[in-house]
């Protein structure tokens, strides 16, 4: 019998080892296949070329992490990292082979995030100041797409097209009635009269304070938009506001009359504009000048960025500035590649602190906040990092609440005028299923050694004593938050109280009240980090977290399977509302703080393109 078990165990481990070997060989084969399929030829750039900024490609801080299926099949959504876009445009301004830039809005306008687009806009203005022409052409310009197109020397539009200038709006969703119908009870605790993050679960509309701050914030971001567009188009803010109030969506001929565009035309005349700007155009009548499959010489931003990397001399020995991207909700534990896990980022920052080649760090925060515990774990690692090397905070579209908590550990804070930040406040949401149990005929009994033994249970609502305990915890976390902000920003208790209470600020307003040091984008923060570290002109940037390699994707999917959930296909008029509902529930699912206390933005805005 003993030999039987020994043989069985040996057979089991032998089989397991064989499976591991086969999987390894299979994974290696897939890697080699992927490399062969995805290999690209060395890029080539000819004279008289136009750089293309495609408004159909979203611009985000970092490229998304792909699934194995997306990596192998190449069906991933195309996304441009912000630094890729800005660096490519700025380098193209100095490259004699690039003679013009085309802002292409023919497909759709998917660009998003006013703060990120402000940095792209500044790069476009520098390109134009170099003496090179920018031409914009589109079918339908969204408000965000037009924000970039307005920088062009010439804006052209298809005769069937239009321009959207109708202002900013938000339509928050409230779950209170739905939760009540489902039998789910909600009890909330918060500190800060403006901390409205609990309102979707307790109210059926916005509180006066939350409505006031959202209205003020929208107005400020809108004024920044109007001022920028007015300056670029030689219009006035009152003119644009009148267009937004009275017309909103302008057909091509009306947009021309209102001087939002310069010409209503078709694609062939766009080619004529590019030719006038010096771009080589394929002429069918001149056989000697024809180039196969080319209307004109062009290169995309992604291709040009790859070309620059290929042509640039390797400087591996230069001191490094690390850019650490913190994007998404802040969650307890390691999290996923779509959010900011406190433990995972804590480890990453420790690794960077111990790397002697890294002389300075930029934390790029694009987060509405989340778990207070996770934010504090990251804050501590930033504090330790700052003690050894300069840490500059760069705020993206939003860096609020838990995102601002982390930012207080940096040496300097840089934000765009239209960044959403602040929201210094905390809250807790306590759900219970007592009514749901009644409806389903479920009953619970209780045995305990004391009145507070089952304080963590969600079976029934919290008692007054239990609520008092939770409120004490919320108050304590808020005091910790205030202390960090007060010490970091050198604010008196009175000044601190006036900027806290969960109130949200634009970057421009935040600078005025002392929450932000300097206005600018990611490159501003990088340059500041280099100056603080006294690196001179010779340094290089290294970005974190590094993308997952294909091997990691392969093993993960060999274990969990290659299947992906198919999304529901909905008509356009339902899709927006369904996506909003999905986002809200997905964000609620990330509420995993061990104490149930959160430092998070009190609303979730998504400015959608038509």
UniProtKB/Swiss-Prot annotation:
Enzyme Commission number(s)? 3.4.21.-
Active-site positions, per UniProt?
A: 195, 401
Q: Which GO terms describe its biological process?
A: signal peptide processing
Keyword Membrane applies: yes
What is stated as this protein's family in its record? Belongs to the peptidase S49 family.
Q: How does it assemble?
A: Homotetramer.
Q: What is this protein called?
A: Protease 4
Query: From which source organism is this entry?
Result: Synechocystis sp. (strain ATCC 27184 / PCC 6803 / Kazusa)
